[in-house]
Amino acid sequence: MSHPMSQSQPATVKHDTLFTTPLDKAARFSFDEQVVACFPDMIRRSVPGYGQVLAMLPIFARRHCKYRQQGDNGQRVSRIYDLGCSLGAASMTLAGEFESQDLQIKAIDISPAMTTEATTLLSDNYPEHDIEVITADIRDIEFEPCDMVILNLTLQFLPAADRVAVLEKIYAALSEGGILVLTEKTHAFDEQYDAWLVERYYDFKRANGYTEMEISGKRNALENVLITDTLDEHHTRLAQVGFQRHLTWFQFLNFVSIVAFK
């Protein structure tokens, strides 16, 4: 298995220097062309465990994608949604481990800058695979029946009031035996634990070359844009929408990944 992070690289990957100079405190983080240009570097240096989460997706898919849906050519294929796909890293990781006729992937992101680059990367690397890149708000998607939904670092950018409705639609679309993989940044219920986790996360970023100005600048830009939940809140919400079984399979500091079973 090739390393998943090595596949999702634009032709020229820039070093993340977005917050090396002071910014207007009112400036909000957005997934624009500037972010796209340095996104792989940003993810590598600021999301602990992201590569490990990606690497497990094909392993999960082999257990839970049963090739139930009929393709146009009569072959049985399995449909997977990659929601908040950014540059398509999850989709490419799956495509790299499955034959082109086995999967139909719908990769969706609200950012035109992201989907434009993702389309190029996916078509260049996996031209034979059935991967559709869609520019849309996942809240507006009418999901088709599917075996697997990937929601990596995406729910946290939705208004809290909209999260249940999205998960309800995902649950309804999943086939029996299908799964949702939900990866999120979280905060701890206990303030002391949370403070420790946050500071260790900043240590992680410092160890990866980020300066105090960069750490502070991004924190300010993400305020009221990225809204975290506690791990318990995630599990409670999953149960609320109908998932009877769901477990935290991965945690690295305040980043967690949950698998929920239909």
Curated annotation (Swiss-Prot):
Catalytic reaction annotation: prephenate + S-adenosyl-L-methionine = carboxy-S-adenosyl-L-methionine + 3-phenylpyruvate + H2O
InterPro entries: CmoA (IPR005271), Methyltransf_25 (IPR041698), SAM-dependent_MTases_sf (IPR029063)
GO molecular function: carboxyl- or carbamoyltransferase activity; S-adenosyl-L-methionine binding
Cysteine disulfide links: none
SUPFAM superfamilies hit by this protein: S-adenosyl-L-methionine-dependent methyltransferases
Coiled coil regions in record: none
Annotated keywords: S-adenosyl-L-methionine, Transferase
Biological processes, Gene Ontology terms: tRNA wobble uridine modification
Enzyme class: transferase
Positions bound to S-adenosyl-L-methionine: Y50, G84, C85, S86, D137, I138, N152, R219
EC number: 2.1.3.-
Pfam families documented for this protein: Methyltransf_25
HAMAP family cross-referenced by the UniProt entry: Cx_SAM_synthase
Function as written in the Swiss-Prot or TrEMBL entry: Catalyzes the conversion of S-adenosyl-L-methionine (SAM) to carboxy-S-adenosyl-L-methionine (Cx-SAM).
Protein family according to the UniProt entry: Belongs to the class I-like SAM-binding methyltransferase superfamily. Cx-SAM synthase family.
Record's subunit section: Homodimer.
NCBIfam families: carboxy-S-adenosyl-L-methionine synthase CmoA
Name listed for the protein in its UniProt record: Carboxy-S-adenosyl-L-methionine synthase
